[in-house]
C-alpha cells in the first residue's frame, strides 16, 4: 500500500515536470518528443515493470520518468526549456505548502498535500543540481552561452 501511495503522489510531479519541458519547447517553435523509458526494447516497458513490481509488493522500486528531446533552440530558449520542469516542481511545492499554511483545504488532506509538496521540493532541488545530466546543468550552460 505504501508503494501505491508513493506512486500516486509521485506520478503527477514527474509527468507534469516532463510535460512542462515539452510544451515550453513547443512554445519556442521546437519539435518536442516525450520519451517514455523502454525496457529491453519494449516501449513503456519501465512503466509496466514498475506496475508489476507494485502489484507483487516488491520492497524496492526505482523509476525513470522519461525525458523530452527537442530540436535545436537558441541558448536562452534552451535554458528556459530546461528550467520549465523544475519550475513546475517549485510551483507544486510552494502551492502545496501554501494550501496548508493558509488553511485553504480540509485538514484531512494535509498529510497527502504535505507529502506531495515535500516530494516536489526534492524534485526541484535534485533537478537543479548543475551537473551534466541534470536540468540545472542545462539551465546554467544555456545562460552561460546566452550571456557570455
Label the predicted regions.
Residues 1-148:
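Hydrophobic transmembrane alpha-helices and their immediate loop junctions
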Amino acid at each position: 500500500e505504501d508503494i501505491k501511495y508513493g506512486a500516486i503522489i509521485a506520478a503527477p510531479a514527474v509527468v507534469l515536470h516532463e510535460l512542462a519541458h515539452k510544451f515550453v519547447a513547443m512554445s519556442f517553435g521546437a519539435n518536442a518528443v516525450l520519451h517514455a523509458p523502454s525496457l529491453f526494447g519494449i516501449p513503456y516497458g519501465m512503466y509496466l515493470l514498475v506496475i508489476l513490481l507494485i502489484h507483487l509488493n516488491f520492497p524496492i522500486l526505482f523509476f525513470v520518468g522519461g525525458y523530452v528531446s527537442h530540436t535545436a533552440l537558441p541558448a536562452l530558449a534552451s535554458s528556459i526549456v530546461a528550467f520549465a520542469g523544475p519550475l513546475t516542481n517549485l510551483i507544486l511545492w510552494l502551492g502545496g505548502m501554501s494550501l496548508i499554511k493558509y488553511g485553504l483545504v480540509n485538514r484531512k488532506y494535509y498529510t497527502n498535500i504535505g507529502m506531495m509538496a515535500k516530494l516536489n521540493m526534492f524534485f526541484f532541488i535534485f533537478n537543479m543540481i548543475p551537473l551534466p545530466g541534470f536540468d540545472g546543468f542545462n539551465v546554467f550552460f544555456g545562460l552561460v552561452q546566452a550571456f557570455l
